């Protein structure tokens, strides 16, 4: 430990103790909060099923930065490089299109064996895995409908894909000793004015009920469902709206996924957390950064990221909220994107843990809103950075921007050699 870091740490402990915060306890609590990193930042959501195919479903990865991963070995190596630069507990979130097989596998035929490399890798790196069926970038999703499709055979294909995905998810949880959160998102919707908004939702309701009909051990698998306001090519109508999935998760007691980019630009998911928790057992968060639309920019340490973290900590939702990331920027170094976004999420959680929440609650209850605002603003200037640097030191990761040197070296030695 350097003398400078030690001095800053001791001063920070004193400053936070003066406002009633035990920084050691804050770091212990931070180690209870894994962040699930999304594999698809590493290859622009290409996957291994048809890497040269186009990305569909109303989502876009923009940019053409060189060196993206082309197979499982490269993607896992890139993830390891990123994870070495991120302190504390982590998980990995996989989509079904990241299966590995010597022969083509139809999506409704995926099995645990197609993900054994990921499980062995997760064991070696002491990671939990989360999962997602991939209801996009496929010939049978080309007309914009999957689980709500009017064609019975096509709809059944996607139902079977999601059912197979649940078994893969349960396999992850059983093998790794930590439940896999499997999130269902579908792109279903219409570009222009829709006359029958009810029938697709009736079909989706029945399809989801069939998907989750097989009882799985909750110690291994957790179902989550995710809404969206609109997508490219589905601007006028989205079958799986917020109201639909809020009702579904409440009535079926599944987890509800809140994605930071899936609502109107004036809405924030930090304000939705406490409301949703009154009705659903668990939440999955997709922390992202929408710029004017669901653009999935890299997560910043901005007001909304901080507000999301603060909601989790203030209401002691550690065991009911699963934190995942969802962004994909192909215009910058993809490993840097992972590191920046994940470190920012963890910084926000640390800052939330260092907040004098008990004192703030007292002021709020007493109606002293002037003091509440003053204290909220003053605590922003407390030396949280010194606590973060100590956390990084204890987890053998770079504290400041020194991590960039490692990313640049990896880019020169590894990424630049890829076609």
UniProtKB/Swiss-Prot annotation:
Residues annotated for Mn(2+) binding in this entry: 262, 294, 296
Pfam families documented for this protein: RhaA
Keywords assigned by UniProt, alphabetized: Cytoplasm, Isomerase, Manganese, Metal-binding, Rhamnose metabolism
Pathway this chain belongs to: Carbohydrate degradation; L-rhamnose degradation; glycerone phosphate from L-rhamnose: step 1/3
One GO molecular-function entry: L-rhamnose isomerase activity
Chief localisation class: cytoplasm
Subunit structure: Homotetramer.
Protein name per the record: L-rhamnose isomerase
Organism: Escherichia coli O17:K52:H18 (strain UMN026 / ExPEC)
